[in-house]
Amino acid sequence: MFKFLSQMQLTRFFVGFRTVLWYFFAPKVTIKYPQEKGPISLRFRGEHALRRYKNGEERCIACKLCEVVCPAQAITIEAAPRESDGSRRATKYDIDMTKCIYCGFCQEACPVDAIVEGPNFEFARENREDLLYDKKKLLDNGSKWESALIKMLNRNDTTH
């Protein structure tokens, strides 16, 4: 009986050893994250950005649809008429990223594609105040990610 049990343990050992050797020489599936980055889907929703027209004018018309549709109530907008033509523009556009659930409703509701969720997922901060985005920060994000945002918005795949 002892001989049988020892043979069973030895068999299990070799099965385990074979598995270890198999995965040791198999192609690696993990990436070294900070140095290597994997592909990002065109549907990915990350850090928010406010876009501008090509002439530099802000796209946001302060319709407040994004504020109304936000289920987390993370968006706050204040509007005022412009002196030049009387159209409304956002004087204050704040997003509390600690409340945001990245649902994309704000992007879908916007009639002029002013607010979008960009490709950036590396925006971790050390304190909470840095996650309260104001209009300037959102416009800077839009300028920084404009080429990637255009690519994401003009994708042919519209199925959900």
From Swiss-Prot:
This is NADH-quinone oxidoreductase subunit I. Gene3D superfamilies: 3.30.70.3270. Disulfide bonds: none annotated. It is a peripheral membrane protein. It is found in: Cell inner membrane. NDH-1 is composed of 14 different subunits. Subunits NuoA, H, J, K, L, M, N constitute the membrane sector of the complex. GO terms for biological process: aerobic respiration.
